């Protein structure tokens, strides 16, 4: 009986430490030091929350930049079903889907004649990547500019202003947050989408 009481006390103490004290301390530190990130890196526009810096959204209108394809959930961009397709490089389903995505990308961007950037036709590991490469953004400039009645140079300037370089100067690649870029487009050309 003595060992059982000791085990129960240890369980209770560690439950309080790891289940209450530690989460409260870490949450308090996060809210105090990194409030924006601790609250989900939410993006506001027009007094409303329109998304998060870290969760991709499905933009389909011609006047918006389109993000990467999503394998999260049945219809994509399902935050509750985050994950990749897990299809290997020799899987015929992946080859067929990629070929279909290339045809779709070319149909949406008929003036683009270069090689389709890989991130324009492949889903990320999470299926919810909010970024595209500057090359993928450049491939969409003509379509977006035409749909918005803007010059391509004005759209390119918005892309450049919303392009982040490598993290710490050497990690990863340059990237464009699609939601932030599309919000900048809405500010530059309101009513034209």
Curated annotation (Swiss-Prot):
It is found in: Cell inner membrane. One of its GO terms (cellular component) is plasma membrane. The chain crosses the membrane at residues 10-30. InterPro entries: KdpC (IPR003820). Keywords: ATP-binding, Cell inner membrane, Cell membrane, Ion transport, Membrane, Nucleotide-binding, Potassium, Potassium transport, Transmembrane, Transmembrane helix, Transport. Signal peptide: none annotated. It is a single-pass membrane protein. PANTHER family: POTASSIUM-TRANSPORTING ATPASE C CHAIN (PTHR30042), POTASSIUM-TRANSPORTING ATPASE KDPC SUBUNIT (PTHR30042:SF2). Belongs to the KdpC family. NCBIfam families: kdpC, PRK00315.1. Part of the high-affinity ATP-driven potassium transport (or Kdp) system, which catalyzes the hydrolysis of ATP coupled with the electrogenic transport of potassium into the cytoplasm. This subunit acts as a catalytic chaperone that increases the ATP-binding affinity of the ATP-hydrolyzing subunit KdpB by the formation of a transient KdpB/KdpC/ATP ternary complex. The system is composed of three essential subunits: KdpA, KdpB and KdpC. This is Potassium-transporting ATPase KdpC subunit.
